[in-house]
Amino acid sequence: MPKKSSSVYETVDAWEAVWGDGVVPTWLAGMTVGFVLLFPLLKMMFPKTIKKHGAFLLAFEIVAFFPLFYCAYEGATAWWFKLDDFTTKEQRLYATSPHARNVLQCNFAFQTWDFFASMLHKETAAPEMLAHHLLAALLCYWAITMPYMHYYGV
């Protein structure tokens, strides 16, 4: 749980914030299992129309749909129904938003998974793409462990 500090905003234990509640490991496991099941299934179902690389990219995109849809749902829910919870400028800067935290945890898991999955295919293993995934995951990690501007994150 977040600990109150003497400052305006909450500080959190990094390990607990990212891994402690099981959200990130669950997303990582779900995406991995989904990909491992879909990839051979797609190759088997469409042997003539989808070659090995086509099956990889299709399985990759199908798996990526779920965390991206979840982030869109959480963001839309927060935007339309929860922004009134932040009434002061201090709250808009320093308060923790459960919806932003959900988006950040899901996106951290997705970017981490995407980094390793991208290394398995030459089209997605370009250095700039891998750097993008690492930097996006790092930004999510920082936003989870040092809550700042969650109001603007959704």
What are these regions (language model features)?
Residues 1-154:
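Membrane-helix and juxtamembrane interface regions of eukaryotic multi-pass membrane proteins
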